[in-house]
Amino acid sequence: MPLIPDFFARAMAAFGVGSGDALAVAVSGGADSMALMKAAADFGKQNKNRVVVLTVDHGLRSESAAEARHVAQWAEKLGVESEILVWRGEKPETGVEQAAREHRYALLFDACRRLKIENLLLGHHKRDQAETFLMRRARGSGEIGLAGMSAVKSFAFGRMLRPFLGIEPSKLRAFARENGLPWVDDPTNATMQFERGRLRQTATSAELEEAFRQTLVYGKKRRETEEQTAAFYARFLTLSPMGYAVLEQDAFLTDCPVLPYALGEILRVVANVPYAPEKTAVESLVSRLKSGFRGCTLGGCRIAPLARRRVLIWREERSLPPAVSFDETGFAYWGGFAVAVSGAPFENFTVDALNRPLKTEINVPKRVVPTLPAIFENEKLCIVPHLGYKQNQMSCQAVFSPVFPLVQTAEWMPPLTV
């Protein structure tokens, strides 16, 4: 069997992807993702897996719509489904690279949720991983960040899988060329305007090889850290389905080496953001929690003492997102909550923060209540699912599903390297 198909099949086995498991494939139109699309399409045919290609039209370049159509056309030629996901709305004038990445993932995650596909394949390869290490090291990242990208990582509606994380991009290009797959080179990948583009023009092969080797070392360390963190959570943490967290005060009397990391991850999940606050800020918070702490805010969260020697962590009201409407299926994602309604027309309904006190017999800290998701019809309060408040016949369910869940010992090592 040729190198890439065999490599892909072994990676899928390592990821626990079985016959019949649906696969979503993120394809930009570059050589690496086109190779991924071909490998996934062939694998799907052999193993009876549904394969759906997802390509994002980001609208940042005049060619982006045509490039997305190019991907969809090749998906059809390979006999797999495809969808073009469009980033609508205004584009930022600064921080474009980061904003584009965040919107791309948001569109991909929502498509996986809508299509009920739990496995999202990404085409990152060995050089991408090495470049990520070098960029993070230049920014002063610690051991956690220097592990680079994970081979497997959970998100709200499934898993991100990177089967090619240990393979050279030259081998992916050769595979694409052998199969007659035309690709598009994104000019922003080579421009000096962006950090990765600058790195690609300056990093040597030896530097990249050593950087990748270092990600394997730090990946092993990160996995050990996450295993210790999981044990810490089991002992000291209660994460409520209402989106707040309670930590036992005794957690701050220990000399647990993962305490700052564990606390940062809790803040990230409660705030429903991609990254934890800066390490120094979290370490300062740990010091305060160990000595006469009265309360503070950090990373979009509020932290305060709670009765019976506990600490309450909940969403800061000013950091809550704006109201969102339901899609045509009656689904909305708001502030880390997956909200679904049915049983009545919902065109005029929105999800927003309750933003007011409300008497309830449900056992919930009063300070948390205004931050809970609520359903409004033309600004009139109708339902607060977590509190049992209901003023119409509509059925509603709200599940706390942060974009990236609390640490679950992701796999930071590539399944195979070539």
Language model features by range: what are they?
Residues 118-119, 125-275:
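Flexible helical/loop "lid" subdomain adjacent to adenine-nucleotide binding pockets
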Residues 31, 62, 91, 99, ...:
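Residue-level detector of secondary-structure boundary/capping sites
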Residues 60, 146, 172, 199, ...:
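Long, contiguous hydrophobic alpha-helical segments, chiefly transmembrane helices and signal peptides
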